[in-house]
């Protein structure tokens, strides 16, 4: 072999070093690929979990909202029924009160009619009271005075002549 060839031919140590460098590069490349794959899989799992959780959360929220809406409807229905019952009771009470007032008015009218009839019977059964009242002056009850009579007689005589 010539010197030129010997110089161009790498030594065993160099070849071994190059092979080790190639193996190291290959190993580093495989490790890096594995790391990327693990990171990618981890992200995919996390994102899948997030998406799944988001869907599940949305479904649970919808179910909870529907349940709350049904409870509100039930509460409204119960309040409506209790309001209707209360209104019915109030109406019955007002009807009873109106009936009681009407019966009281009718009883008062009957009592007034009875009293009027009694007064009429009493007034027709007793003799008519004298026209004179203790407060009034009656000219019929007064004794005639002679001076008035003479005065009126003389006035009449003078008028006649």
From Swiss-Prot:
Biased composition (Low complexity): 144-161
Compositionally biased intervals (Polar residues): 1-10
Keyword annotations: Coiled coil
Coiled coil start-end: 82-107
Pfam families named in the record: CCDC50_N (PF15295)
Region annotation Disordered: where it falls in the sequence: 1-20, 55-84, 118-161
Disulphide linkage map: none
Domain of life of the organism encoding this protein: Eukaryota
UniProt name for this protein: Uncharacterized protein R10H1.1
Organism: Caenorhabditis elegans
């Amino acid at each position: 072999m010539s010197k030129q060839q010997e110089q161009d031919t790498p030594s065993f140590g160099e070849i071994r070093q190059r092979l080790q460098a190639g193996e190291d590069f290959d190993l580093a490349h495989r490790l890096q690929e594995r790391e990327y794959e693990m990171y990618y899989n981890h992200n995919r799992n996390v994102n899948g979990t997030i998406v799944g959780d988001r869907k599940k959360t949305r479904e649970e929220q919808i179910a909870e909202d529907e349940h709350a809406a049904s409870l509100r409807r039930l509460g409204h229905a119960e309040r409506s029924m209790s309001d209707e019952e209360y209104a019915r009771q109030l109406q019955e009470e007002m009807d009873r009160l109106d009936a009681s007032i009407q019966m009281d008015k009718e009883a008062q009218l009957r009592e007034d009619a009875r009293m009027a009839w009694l007064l009429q019977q009493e007034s027709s059964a007793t003799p008519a009271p004298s026209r004179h009242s203790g407060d009034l002056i009656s000219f019929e009850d007064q004794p005639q005075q002679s001076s008035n009579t003479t005065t009126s007689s003389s006035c009449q005589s003078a008028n006649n002549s």
